[in-house]
UniProtKB/Swiss-Prot annotation:
Keyword set includes DNA-binding: yes
Biological role: Catalytic component of the SWR1 complex which mediates the ATP-dependent exchange of histone H2A for the H2A variant HZT1 leading to transcriptional regulation of selected genes by chromatin remodeling.
Protein name per UniProt: Helicase swr1
Compositional bias annotation for Basic and acidic residues: 12-21, 45-59, 1586-1600
Intervals of motif DEAH box: 953-956
Domain Helicase ATP-binding: 837-1002
Biased composition (Acidic residues): 468-507, 534-545, 570-611, 652-666
Family: Belongs to the SNF2/RAD54 helicase family. SWR1 subfamily.
Source organism per UniProt: Emericella nidulans (strain FGSC A4 / ATCC 38163 / CBS 112.46 / NRRL 194 / M139) (Aspergillus nidulans)
Subunit text: Component of the SWR1 chromatin-remodeling complex.
Region of interest (Disordered), residue spans: 1-249, 456-682, 763-818, 1586-1632, 1673-1698
Boundaries of every HSA domain copy: 329-403
Amino acid sequence: MQNGTTIGIPPENERVTERAEPVPSDLLPNNSPVNSPTIDPTLSEIKDVAADHNEEPPSKRRKVAGSTPSRRSHSRAASPPWKKAGADGPTSKIVDGKRRSTRVSNVGPVEQPPSDAKPTRSSQKQYVSKAVSSQRNAAVSSPLPMSPSRSGINRRSLAGVAVNGSPSTTAKGSIGRRRRESPSPVSKRASTRTRPDNMDAYHPSNGVTPRSNSTKTRSTRSFQLASSDFREETADDIGNDGQDEHGQRIQRLRIKVKKPALSIQHPSHVLPTRKYGSFKEWLENEGTGPGRMLTMTDALEEAQKRRQVTEAMEPGGLLSSEVCSAFLPEPQEELPQQFSHQDHLVAHALYFKKLLDKEHRAHRQAAKSLAAACAEVWRKRNKDPEDILREQQEEMRGKRKQLAKDLKKMFELARAEIDRVRLARWEEEQKAKDQRALDRAIKQSTMLFEKRRLEILGETGSDAPETTTDDEEVETDNGSENDDEEGESNMSTETEEEDGDDRDDDVGLTAEELRLKYANLPDTNPHPDQSPYSDEDSEDSDDIAADNTPGDTSGGVNRSPPPDSSGQVELDEVDPVLIDDSDESTDMDDDMGDSDDDGYSEAESDDEDGGEPGLLGFFSAKDLSLSNLHQTNSGEGDTHQTGADGDRNEDSSFDESEFGSEDPDEVTLVPTGPTNKDLSTPATVTASAELEPAAMTPSIDQTSTEEPIAIGTETPIETVAEDAAALADTEPVDVDVLDTSTNDSVPPVMSPATNLLKQIERQQHEPYHSRAASSEASPGTVATKPSEPESVSSIEAPAEKHAQPSESPGPGLKTPIPHLLRGTLREYQHFGLDWLAGLYSNHINGILADEMGLGKTIQTIALLAHLAVEHGVWGPHLVVVPTSVILNWEMEFKKWCPGFKIMTYYGNQEERRQKRRGWMDDNSWNVLITSYQLVLQDQQVLKRRSWHYMILDEAHNIKNFRSQRWQALLTFRTRARLLLTGTPLQNNLTELWSLLFFLMPTDGDEAGIEGFADLRNFSEWFRRPVEQILEHGRETMDDEAKQVVTKLHTVLRPYILRRLKADVEKQMPGKYEHVVYCRLSKRQRYLYDGFMSRAQTKETLASGNYLSIINCLMQLRKVCNHPDLFETRPISTSFAMPRSVATEFETSEALVRRRLLYQHPLEKLDLDFLNLVPISREDISRRLADDSARIMAYAPFNTLRERQYHRTNWEMKFNGSTVQSTLEALENDCRKRRMAELERSLYFESKRHGRRPVYGSSLIEFLTADSKQRPTAHGPLRKRSYADWLSSQSSVLASMMMSLEERSQAMDGYIQRFACVTPAAVAAGVTEAALTPISTRHLTNKERFPPHDPFHEAQMRLSIAFPDKRLLQYDCGKLQRLDKLLRDLKAGGHRALIFTQMTKMLDVLEQFLNIHGHRYLRLDGTTKVEQRQILTDRFNNDNRILAFILSSRSGGLGINLTGADTVIFYDLDWNPAMDKQCQDRCHRIGQTRDVHIYRFVSEYTIESNILRKANQKRMLDDVVIQEGEFTTDYFTKLDVRDMIGNDEALKDEASAAMDRVLENRVTNTSRVFEQAEDKEDIDAAKNAQKELEHADDGDFDDRANANASGVTAASASASGAGQTPTQAGTPLPDEAQQSLNANNAEVAEDTADSDPSVGHIDDYLLRFMEWNMKDEPLVLPVDKSMKKSKKGKEHRLRKRRR
């Protein structure tokens, strides 16, 4: 391409990328000599041009005269990437920051000298060929073209420079101009974006790049590097003109070989264009500027011109002000003319002309259109064959294009549909996988719980007669010994099987086996959802029925292979705990000796110890090696024993590699139990053999333990098809092998069903047969694994045991109370100890979740004492508790178990360091008690120890698995773990998962440790009921959600023990909760509404930022608690101005006052002083004037004056020459001053006593007549008028006419109460400016303090207003309500605990209680550990203390405050479990009065929503935890008759209730859901329903056919496996869509095979696309929640990468 047009290249040959093609033979390099005269003129011409343009911009290329190159058969090579399609030279330049065109150059073209030869292309090629051949050894590249990668790199690097430096243009005008200016083929180049197909054909024949302008290029580049990047890039464009991109010129023009130039940062950086283009031009124009040298002639001419100008400026001249127009004033702007009629006429005429022109153009356009239409009609009528053919070709071409577009779109739609189907299939597989995982977890939990239950009910609840004889016992003993010696499994021997054939069929069967045996009776009710384990029951019953067919030789209990074929039959993934029914307290230490087996052989115990407990059924690959431990024949013992030893080795190696071998008692996070089988003693074997008949007696409902089911094998479990919930619980299991550890053999002949109930009743009423007293556990405790009655250290021979008295602790309990424990445990606490001991024996970690106040601490201490007494394990134990209860735990240990050595690990860093001295010694202490904070601080030190038992009190402190506490405590090396919490579920299921995963962690690898499920699976399992409870309440849960909740209970039941006070403590006082709604005060409502109306608040709430929203909600809660927490009531003061307005005029006022009042002292005389104002003395009486004149001392003063006058020397002057003269002069001066004083006193005395009135006051009073009564005047002096004075007195008038002091005292209360409004502003200096200043106040000794100012109180209260103390209460609605409540409680003799979350609110409550004079105590986070226990004891013992104010975060944990019977929650917690913790501080054991709980809630505020949210969380806790019945007496509610024979009654009753409530509503509800849901959701729901209803129809049909026709169970299992996929457990999506059940699917397949009709193209396209995409990985949808927020970055444009 050249300037966007093709030069000799057809359009179909245009390409953007290069295409490598072979070079034609005629274009190969030619090494023939070339004539040098043809080259010399061109070379000289180039040198001249380079010399002329060495320091100036390059000129444009011009056409060489007479150069008419021959047209080549191939196109030119593509232009270099930096060469644009515009003009050759720069098309623009930057001058003063503006872009200017360079097409018009100031420099003219340089004349080229004529050459003899024409510079044709061939001559240039020959010159280049010769130059290259002559310099072959120099730095010249080979003729071969550059590699594409290298050339591409060069193109990219140089292209960037060209784009950034020189803006090129591709306008059509420039293209045409270049065509006219440069028709020479030298300037023709292809565009950078086009590559012809025959690219190699454009290479020169000699194989190298032409170098016709190399000298010019170097000179130009040297100039451009000195100027700027812009000109540098321009030089690159010019210097590389016509170069091939495969040539060497690109490498030689790299900038790195030159000096780097500064980039243009400012327009001034661009060098200005030279004024003169050549030296000749400069010579011609030199001397014409203003600074040139003038000759004499020029100077004379200049002088003459200036003289003429000066003369013309004289008056009368041409340039004078009178003549020149430049001096005339500027003309006035004329007013615009008014739009007249003529203007209207002209405008109308112009508009009319415009209309005419428009009409004319329309006519012409219509004529053209008509002509074109006529021509088209004419052309269609007279078509040539060529035109017809061309039109058909065009039409076909258009159809082909449209067809291609349609096919492309159809393929895209098909691909999208296939992706959607694959994604839906993947989602269903994930759901099925999650469902299978849940089923495994439920199955595992059910089996584990059943095992614990059967350990109790199997020995204490079963009353079957002891049918075995002594011979059989001896035989059993021998069998057990043989098993121990030969390493056989825990199955019965062949001799026992033979003996078992002589017994009755039903006598040796357990209750569960009897129920399974007769499960296929016709009257069975198909509603197994009423029992928590009905799913498993129905499944097992079907399995037994199918396996016990007469023709089945491989199923049932008798299909175990002979001993010689033991290696061929294995069980996959069978957990050892599910097979072993041992109920003894297994020793958890490897070096503590043996464990007793109660009713089972030694091999059984070894099998249990060797395997890991399958926690919640999450099997890993490690369990595959355990499968050979549990077989159904005793002949397989060798193989089993080998597998067990292998597993033990693996476990031990894993422990050592994981944690090292620091402590021999050290184990992994999930303990694996004893690993040495050799620890068993002969005494244990004997005891096991002796107690084995007891285990062989029938027990109740032993589904889980009697029938170990391997998970993950090919045969699915049959379930009842009518129950959707039961179908949801199904999972693929292996039922080929049944455990017969309890019953040695099942006879093929079965007893009638009518004898079943009678036999059960007879067994129930028969007394227990005598066994070893210490080995027997009494009935009563269910759902609790009995621990071993005898400790490991006290094992005795069986003969001795028969002689010992019974040591059974009580009915239903197997764990005796350890003798180390001081005190008596309550019955439920003993059951809790038994449950904890069972957990320890089975290597299971658990949660003791008893309600607060039931003694979890005591049960934990009893457990540790049990370990010390029964197992000899004294520690070390780690107990982590909240800080507030560290000393409480220490006191409880010293009180209940003083035999333990306790270390309370707290204090500062130095104290803790002192406590750690020598603490590695196991004998220094047994139990370490510390807090969660110190565990985090000293975790590195604490992790060095290997802890036997780690106990976490208030375990909800680790409810967040992202917290440091959870992560730090998880990595501690412990043998067992126990969590104590009264609130296992606080906010959501994630917190419950955190606790369970902490107990049963997993390493995340399928081949690693078995642990609990991950968070995603756990959340997916139980998401539906949680959402329904939180959104609509527990009443709106559908059946599926209720079934999911039941499954959750099943999963959690083996690991949680939860008892409520109402269940275990019947004598506990009642608890009553009250919600007190408080109205907001006026100030609270003002602040609340003001904060909500802020724009910032609305923006924050709408932003979605979690922390910002929480901050806003916290501010609102502060307003609800007390407005002072949000905004403190200020001390109201007026705005103090720095100075008043009058103060500014103080100086002027003083100056004016001074000038106005200034006068000479003699100008104005005091006439009054001179007695010249006679009437001014009328205020004195005549008598006083006479007395004053009589005592006048004028004569004595005059005598003294005369004497002093004669003593004074008036002519003496100061003489300081001598001391004597100086003293005399000073004495004389004193006499002069004394003389002046006497003269002044004489003067004043004469004037003072000369004051005489004209009339006198006595005369005036005597002559004045006062007609008004004076009732308040003083009493008369004469007694005779005293009665008249009293009669005229009035007390009312006297009280009304009070003095100023009396009035101020009377109004003092009003001033204190109501003087609160201060002026808006005050200014200093106003008083001085308005009033006359007081000069001096003299205070005598009697007046040390100024007199009382009656206005002082009012002035202070009106100038600064302190808030009234009573406003603390009246500003808050809650405090007003609290005041009334506390008065009522105090009157009734009650005491209260006041909880709040905010520490500042505690300060407000303190002020409130101090105002009202109530006694109180305070406890918050700043209270020291030692002080907390003192405060608790003081409150419980001192009844005078009315209230205890506490922080719910610190005072609500672990302390005992039974002295109070009222709990007041001043504010609500987000977490209702925290409030429950707080209220149970007083509602606990030891409380004798009813407890009332008051919750203060502000109306119409955020607190109402908090209360609603807390109620939702409480409902979730009730559904998940409370209704789970995680108690030890759970199974006592189930009667034996109900579990065995009365299933039908349960199912009927439940089914009737369900039908009455949900018969019609379910259908209608589903239809409503279908109307509201999307089509995809409806289809998915239908598919799931089909799977639930028809997934196992084929299995049931096959098994039914097998029972009828006598086919084997193996064939039935194979057919069933063929119907249901092994891995998914549910039909595939396409199978579910094609058929409703397996039979319909087969019919549909047969019909499809026999139908010869052709399918639709869409189906074929979908199948083809699915086949085509089978190897492509499925692209999962992006999780939008994980995408980073791009808020605020929308304005940033994404840069394109080149």
